[in-house]
Amino acid sequence: MCGPAMFPAGPPWPRVRVVQVLWALLAVLLASWRLWAIKDFQECTWQVVLNEFKRVGESGVSDSFFEQEPVDTVSSLFHMLVDSPIDPSEKYLGFPYYLKINYSCEEKPSEDLVRMGHLTGLKPLVLVTFQSPVNFYRWKIEQLQIQMEAAPFRSKEPCMAEEVCSMSWYTPMPIKKGSVVMRVDISSNGLGTFIPDKRFQMNINGFLKRDRDNNIQFTVGEELFNLMPQYFVGVSSRPLWHTVDQSPVLILGGIPNEKYVLMTDTSFKDFSLVELSIDSCWVGSFYCPHSGFTATIYDTIATESTLFIRQNQLVYYFTGTYTTLYERNRGSGSWIRVLASECIKKLCPVYFHSNGSEYIMALTTGKHEGYVHFGTIRDGQVSFEMLPRQWSVCEQIGVTTCSIIWSEYIAGEYTLLLLVESGYGNASKRFQVVSYNTASDDLELLYHIPEFIPEARGLEFLMILGTESYTSTAMAPKGIFCNPYNNLIFIWGNFLLQSSNKENFIYLADFPKELSIKYMARSFRGAVAIVTETEEIWYLLEGSYRVYQLFPSKGWQVHISLKLMQQSSLYASNETMLTLFYEDSKLYQLVYLMNNQKGQLVKRLVPVEQLLMYQQHTSHYDLERKGGYLMLSFIDFCPFSVMRLRSLPSPQRYTRQERYRARPPRVLERSGFHNENSLAIYQGLVYYLLWLHSVYDKPYADPVHDPTWRWWANNKQDQDYYFFLASNWRSAGGVSIEMDSYEKIYNLESAYELPERIFLDKGTEYSFAIFLSAQGHSFRTQSELGTAFQLHSQVDVGVVLADPGCIEASVKQEVLINRNSVLFSITLKDKKLCYDQGISGHHLMETSMTVNVVGSSGLCFQETHLGPHMQGNLMVPVFIGCPPGKRLAFDITYTLEYSRLKNKHYFDCVNVNPEMPCFLFRDIFYPFFLIQDLVTGDSGSFQGSYVLLVVGGGPTLDSLKDYSEDEIYRFNSPLDKTNSLIWTTRTTRTTKDSAFHIMSHESPGIEWLCLENAPCYDNVPQGIFAPEFFFKVLVSNRGVDTSTYCNYQLTFLLHIHGLPLSPKRALFIIMVSASVFVGLVIFYIAFCLLWPLVVKGCTMIRWKINNLIASESYYTYASISGISSMPSLRHSRMGSMFSSRMTEDRAEPKEAVERQLMT
């Protein structure tokens, strides 16, 4: 609607002069606290943008968040850190982006402010919260946060100053697998300028890509940079539909006659106008009675990975590229048309995911009237099913024609609530609420909506019993709204019906029947905003019966008058609301402003508390004459003056929020400014910290229950040495890494408010107290039997439970008469009735607790420097089941100690593996397990019962195989008759069917059998040592442990050595070994007996050979010298005789020596 509708003239003002003066005085008085806040606190705000890794230090740049993979740009720097507690051989990666942080105050340059803040000690603290993924079958459910301290960095711009001209603070922008939605909370360290905390949405945009020129562009269409006024001025607002807390990219259509949508990945802090690349075709047929064609995108729904749109009767979807969620090839290349043969008249959102999937509903007209197309989205894959599966809704409720107007899905009950319009012959149209169960395919008619609006007769609400009188105005329902936490159901149209049990409905008479609701914005935390067809805004607190008009109203008149006086850039005299939505329990508007023929699209907060307070004060005030003047006083309808929460327990045990802390490395520079290398090292340290968290899911428990223990385990003793190096500026690389700066936090303190959510295990309690200071004298005495007087308070507190059969609450009142106050102690407890067992964080039951101070709804406000805050109504979602962050681990440390104590010895494998110690086959195996709480750091012995099964195994790690169900039964069941048991125990307790043993920490232990048909029987040794075997062991407490809702399942490998051989193989080895041994003995004896003879024979053979050689030499010489003279011959004979004699003389002593040695 156009701007004037947002700035109504209001009712005619009284023309009495004093009343006009009082109105002006009222505006000043109501803004007085604001003026005081401006005087004492500068209106400063944090500013955060995203910068790529390579653009650190550049001014005026902001990057889009679409890169999702770690970058290898920091590993070379870690190799220089030789004198640091880290291991340079580890793999350190970085993230693609940094967070650049500044702040600004009104009428002051930002550069001067940031520089002043740095010099006064200001340091931004950044808390990044990773949203858990939808598909818990692929990713672990966890509530993870990392707190970082921003590092100061000088700008790269030219500077004439000696130290710094402009600067900013930087922290890494971490990315976690499975998470695409991240909240960034910026706060101050308490020094320097006071700056209120601020939250930013930093979500991954999977609908962006780089073109050939390295420019970023949208994959869904073409971005437009000119926001023409005709796109927004005079256009009706429309709802913003998305999966709550899971959608990284929001999309909003409704621009007339254009294929344009608004897209944002920062919840409209910034946005883009995109023309979608769809065909815009329209196919008319006899079953699809469309009267015309338009290019307008009517319905838009955003999920975790996929966008849905409806144009005319056509439905399209586009899946983003999210490598952190699934494979890269899941992203769409273009818009995909679904339900091509159907005529779709409306898309209905499903606000919450369940069972690892998200959902969407499409309502048809034409040939499949009376059916709902139910869409399921998981990991970017979309599938539709037509429901009901057999007969249409019309046929099952017994009418010939009907039309489904709206559909609401209650995920926890697998139920569709359908608003059905039906015709009965010539009668007028009637409306019913129909329930359809998607699991059982059962349909039930829940409620017949009255034909006419009831006559309230001045009452705020009216119970619909069928006996009340009615007006002549027909009911025209348009939709159904269900809050899964408190089970409240609203049927809305030109009326409001409310129910908590789907059977009995209450008519809320404050909403005028002359108006018609267009859509409802839901916070799911107890507040609902209503937008009518005439763009009026109404407000409702769930569970109460008052409906407040926010716009147009007297309160809005006062508020906008003050804003225009302050020349706020968020308000104008001509404005159009595009949508109304909740974010973090706060109501926001997306508004198009027209100032001096210039348009601007802004997101602004709707100050609900201020509007209600202004409206209350403008309607209820007194004029008292004192002397010669009138005194203005306001009536305070709030039953208390002060409300505080006390005795709040440590939040992490109930919120299941895991938090890490990471500080930047210390730079060895006089100015304290970081450089690109130190920031890159900061990136690598944060990455490694989160990597340690992701891999801390080993079945073998560490001696110290902390993911960071292994990081510093070998360097803690040298901490003083590293401190000495840093103190003397001798640390390598110019940075010093402090081990205590990277840790997991287990002792978060309560923030004096109820937690965002509460998880309750079996029989768990949550206790807190509410302190209320009453207005005036709110106590009375009353005599009761047995006491003289009993003190009673006029201030009462009520606790409303959505499921009283599952949880219970007790309230104890303590009257503090001397302080005119009351202390209410409230305890919420699980009743152990509504949940069986489940995996940690899976399939939790959703319910809620609401605490109301009687008579305070919409009337009580607390003044703060950030504005008024509504009090008296507290609503907390409660999740019943196995909380996230709890796991079962094999206590290898105590198991080894206890085994050594009981067996009197311990023998490890020959090849020792510290990560997987061995156990000897013949020893009794005493397993112990730990319940580790990853959130609080608690780690204690598992005291419950469990079933232990060997589900796989193999002689080596490479030959491991999983056993079939039949094999698992034969290898583990005491009922087995096939001689296949692997182990046994003296425990007599078994499951109900006696199939398996039930064990506990008090069990007598396990004896290994490996019978004849077991896989570990008769294994061939891989060497000279006894055979080994690896058992894959499954431990589960499902169905046998009643102490918890948690279905603990642990699978780990057990290394057993010293397995015995089968009798046949043992006999064979003995026979072979004995044969070899006997053969060796016989050979040795024979060798000892025959050796002297062999030596003697060898000697004689040698002597004969020598003689033979000498004889041959003599005869050869004689024949050659026969022709010589006789003297020569005679001389030769004498020489030869002399030589022979000399040879014989040498041989005789040699033979004598050999005989002596042989004897």
UniProtKB/Swiss-Prot annotation:
> Could you tell me where the Basic and acidic residues compositional bias lies?
1142-1159
Which residue ranges are recorded for the region named Disordered? 1139-1159
Q: Which residues are glycosylated?
A: 102, 355, 426, 574
User: How the protein sits in the membrane?
Assistant: Single-pass type I membrane protein
**Transmembrane spans:** 1066-1087
Indicate where this protein is primarily found.
Answer: membrane
Q: Which GO BP terms apply?
A: cell differentiation; spermatogenesis
Provide the membrane-side ranges marked Extracellular in the record: 36-1065
Keywords (alphabetical) are:
Cell membrane, Cell projection, Cilium, Developmental protein, Differentiation, Disulfide bond, Flagellum, Glycoprotein, Membrane, Signal, Spermatogenesis, Transmembrane, Transmembrane helix
Q: Which residues lie on this side of the membrane: Cytoplasmic?
A: 1088-1159
Give me the Gene Ontology terms describing cellular component: CatSper complex; motile cilium; plasma membrane; sperm principal piece
- Lyase in keyword set: no
Q: What superkingdom heads the lineage?
A: Eukaryota
- Provide the family line: Belongs to the CATSPERG family.
PANTHER family from the UniProt entry: CATION CHANNEL SPERM-ASSOCIATED AUXILIARY SUBUNIT GAMMA (PTHR14327:SF1), CATION CHANNEL SPERM-ASSOCIATED PROTEIN SUBUNIT GAMMA (PTHR14327)
Role played: Auxiliary component of the CatSper complex, a complex involved in sperm cell hyperactivation. Sperm cell hyperactivation is needed for sperm motility which is essential late in the preparation of sperm for fertilization.
Q: What is this protein called?
A: Cation channel sperm-associated auxiliary subunit gamma
* Organism of this sequence: Homo sapiens (Human)
